[in-house]
Amino acid sequence: MRDNEPHEIPAQTSPGLTRSASGVGEPEHLGEKWATGTRKKWLRCENKALLECYYSSNPSQRGYMQRMCGEWERRNPHSRLMAKQLVAQCSNIHKRQLLSQLEIDEIQHKCYGKGEPGRQVRGEVSPSPQPEIGYEAPISTDTLSEAATDLKDKIMARINRQPRTPLQRLSEVPSESLMEDVNAALRAIPTTTITETNELIYASASVILEVLGYKSNHGSHEKQYPPWKRRLEAKIKAAQREVSQMTEAQRGAMKRPMPKRYSQMTIPEALEIAKQRLQALASRLKRYTRDNEARRINRLFATQPAKVYSQWQGNNNRADPPRLETEQYWKGIWEREASHNSDAQWLVDLREDHSNLPEQNPVTITVADIQHRVSGMKNWTAPGPDMIHVYWLKKLTAIHKRLAAQMNQLLRDGTHPEWLTEGRTILIMKDPSKGAVPSNYRPITCLSTTWKLMSGIIAAKISGHMSQYMSEAQKGIGKDTRGAKHQLLVDRTVAKDCRMRHTNLCTAWIDYKKAYDSMPHTWITECLELYNINRTLRAFIANSMRLWRTTLEANGKPLAQVSIKCGIYQGDALSPLLFCIGLNPLSQIINKTGYGYRLRNGATISHLLYMDDIKLYAESERDIDSLIHTTRIYSSDIGMSFGLEKCGRMVTKRGKVIHTEGVSLPEGRIADIEDNYKYLGIPQANGHLEQATRNAATAKYLQRVRQVLRSQLMGKNKSRAINSYALPVIRYPAGIIRWPKEEIQTTDVETQKLLTMHGGFHPISSTLRLYASRKEGGRGLVSVRATIQDETSKIHKYIKEKAPTDDVLSECLRQWRTEDEMLEEGPSWEDKPLHGMYHRNITEVADLNKSYQWLERAGLKDSTEALILAAQEQALSTRAIEAQIYHTRQDPRCRLCKEAPETVQHIRCWQGKHTWNAITK
């Protein structure tokens, strides 16, 4: 409307005419009779149809009012509206923002046609990878020691040995002298390209493993059959045969002579002995198998606890997906050629708004960047096709300088070798009940370690430039933020404000279909140009995306190779940043609409973003529908679509949820949610369903505790597993929802009961000692009470730090009201008269640290630990305990000497031992 002549679209009708009124989204009648003193309530679809009539009437030419009125009457034969009334409503739509700007632009584009093609995105994309240009690292001229020379020869002999096999994880740290010799040898080995440097890293790691005595992983990865098991099974078969022979002999049907070992026995006696021998061998096999499995799971837990947790969660299903269907399914997603709508009006406006942004400074990768990035990466995460763990990048410091130079060379060239961005995607079954269908597998991509290093550095450089442009609503990336917890705090603040002030609040949850797999590469390149990312990085990333490909694997078997032509990787630091940059313009567009919910302190919140999880806020049904349509238009133009079955809308009037018919979209309908909806894992309705959340978290926590206690982990590892596997279920909602003290105490008591049921805790042992650290003589368990208190305190501290600069968190702090509840300082277990007696007795005569080292190093079962600690705490059922604690006995004196009380100290003292020995003799 801004391009039309102002005198032809009056701001309001003449005084004698009835003025139109908007009533988008409100109940209305369908009649169009206008009488003096009445108003017509326009539907959203009618407003859209009216704008279509307006733009199709060519409003820049004379006589457009008659043409618009004629088109309106053709569509609505029974309408009695006059041309001036239609023009007034058009003006009303713009002035009162009855439709969002994106909806108006979409209608305008639809009526005017595509017009002139939009400009092409400058991607600086080369059609194919260029030959790798080399950078020769300077060679050290220092004289090598004999050990370094020997290592150099071994490394040179292993370079370019194919195929690569997975490298083993180290169970101990190599000596400093060995690593110094290896780094000295590396300085004397020249490499020209990053490919050669990668070969050098792999060869060096292989040689180090060989020197340390690790066996190569060549050959089959199948589990070897233990020799002891083979021998025992052979003995069991022989014993079964003997039992069968004895049974036949007892019936008189055996023609062969008796086995030699039973020749001097009667047949019934020999049969009984054979059966007992068979039972003993079977029990031995069962015991050995159980003990061997216990050793295996404890070794695995010591190095890869996540694998143990995955097994407990049922993610070890070995069913292979169908090869052909899986290949077709993922190629249909990733190899789909997709592009964004470069002619969208909102994008044209966005380009104009961003035309004067300064370009990012030139990027140079330094040795300090390499060291900083490597220090923040995990040592033993699953490697990509290069089979190199991050640990070796940390230890082989001699290659850092050449890596930095060779990465800079790649940036200048604008491309890289194809292997650098190749990945291997492991397909893991989601729900075993759905079977081996391709859509029931979750893809986990492992990328080359060198690429993860380089992409992480590039992501850090881009983040530094984008920090001034990224929306505050996006908390999926960024530093110094609590991420999902921050979004939940904001959401909790809005919901509580609505309930307390009885205001109107409309919310909507938006979910994308295959969000990470559907964002076009052209849109990513467009956004990098939009925010004026350094042109060298733009060219490199654009060319890199053309080379993305991965090999699908299931249960260690390769299925197919797929090119990533649409979507992003989910295995490096750069891809999430690119995805968030691709959604960042949506925040700017939503903010421009002016819609949102106004808090008590005047702060306005219109939307929240956590990666692809979007939540919209508005004060009226009309406004929330406009935000939904705005988001839909944006998503459609960039090539992404809603997953309507997971989207939802909720309308709250005066603090109470009401039912409406939802909102209609071209793809379908977004239904209203009345009961609950999970946002970032927290159930929601009119605010938070706190009781339901607490119940669900507690039930899942106790279920995981049972899984841990049923396992064959040693006592120390069970405590670690409960702390790191079960307690996070409680920690996540803590600080967001209130947790009554009674429920916290009940959950801790339930945990202690489960420990007692599985033999890991004596019924009358000290619960305080259960939660003390193992260095101090405790069991190292963390209580639910301490977990909730710790997380709540951290959240409160975070709110206080951010409140001065964040108006929403400032209101959240005002709602919080009460200060942190500090843990009550009660007596420690050492001060208890009975439980702390042993500790007090040895404090003066023994080294406490060494006295409790067995709790950390012995590797005992939890039942054994519980028994030893119960004895130290006087918790065994002696006569003194029965008389003084249980009150089931009157005489606490020792049953042997009849003099001193029968305590644990008395039983183990020299007098008790002497009395016992005298009686037994």
Where are these regions (language model features)?
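Conserved pre-catalytic core of RNA-dependent polymerases
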Residues: 352-585, 907-911, 916
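Short, conserved micro-motifs composed of acidic
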Residues: 8, 12-13, 556, 628, ...
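Surface-exposed loop/turn segments and immediately adjacent short secondary-structure elements
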Residues: 133-142, 241, 248-439, 449-453, ...
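Trihelical helix-turn-helix/Myb-like DNA-binding core that engages the DNA major groove
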Residues: 40-41, 56-103
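Basic, alpha-helical interaction scaffolds
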Residues: 667-741, 759, 794-809
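Surface polyanion/phosphate-binding segment centered on an Asp-His-Pro turn
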Residues: 132-248, 698-705
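Catalytic palm active-site di-aspartate
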Residues: 201, 330, 384, 422-425, ...
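Helix/loop segments that flank and initiate small ligand/metal-binding modules
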Residues: 731, 773-774, 782-783, 821-901
